[in-house]
Amino acid sequence: MATSIAASSTATNVFASTPQFTRPTFLMCPPEWYGVDYVLNPWMAGNVHRSSRDLAFAQWKGMHNVLRSVADVRLLHPEPGCPDMVFVAHSALIHNGVAALSSFNPQQRRAETAYLRRWLISQGFLLWETPRETPFEGEGDVAFNDDGNALWAAHGVRTCRAAHRHVADAWHVPVTSLHLSDPRFYHLDTCFTPLAGGYILYYPGAFDAASNAAIEHAYPANRRIAVSEHDATHMACCALNLGRTVFTGEITRELATRLFDAGFDVVQLELSEFIKGGGGAKSLALRLSDLPVTHARLGLLPVS
């Protein structure tokens, strides 16, 4: 079921003392302790203790080097006992200097929030805490549209629908709730990513009928890039977008052509070790800069 929620009037005020970025800026966390040590999602099933930390680090370094060539990349120190900390985008949602911290439902990931909280405080971000009883998993389940003036949020697996109101209060923006109906797509970022220029990259099979109707209402047909099940199960939608460039894992030639025809350059990354843990390119980098700054660096696509 898809619903729209208007933010309440108790939105956080953004002060001039919060961090200001003039370049696209992201936070990444090296996979020093990464491993598939338990099962929290269907991707982990069958891969417990089958991931290679050396290969994961090489793949992470490849993405880090590529991203660093077009953006500033800050690093969060990895902590022992937090093998999923590399998926740093799940730990918060950031916009206008305000960081809405996650409230992880899985016990195995709860310690990550404290480490990110400490880093964000040191950098001057305002914190928007999430109640313990309100599961919310940051960029994993909530995404701004490309203008940064509205939110899309998922529920049904890891984030509860009540968290959507909480997120709306942080920035005083409307939120459209989407229901995830396929357990393989346990996070919104595995099946839905707004792109610059008013485009959406998504897998319709991950959502119920009402949610697909909401997406189709918001995005005209010529702005919807619906992916195949094959591409979806290779984390094609878990993509990082900077202006005219889309960073993603390995995708089919057909999808790459469709993105190119829409005006995007595609950078394909080898991220197989992270797919074993249920993540892709977007999961590995938490956006710190505001969307206008993030997209302007590589050119914002005009909407025609």
Residue ranges and their predicted role:
Residues 2-304:
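The feature marks the mature, well-folded catalytic cores of soluble enzymes
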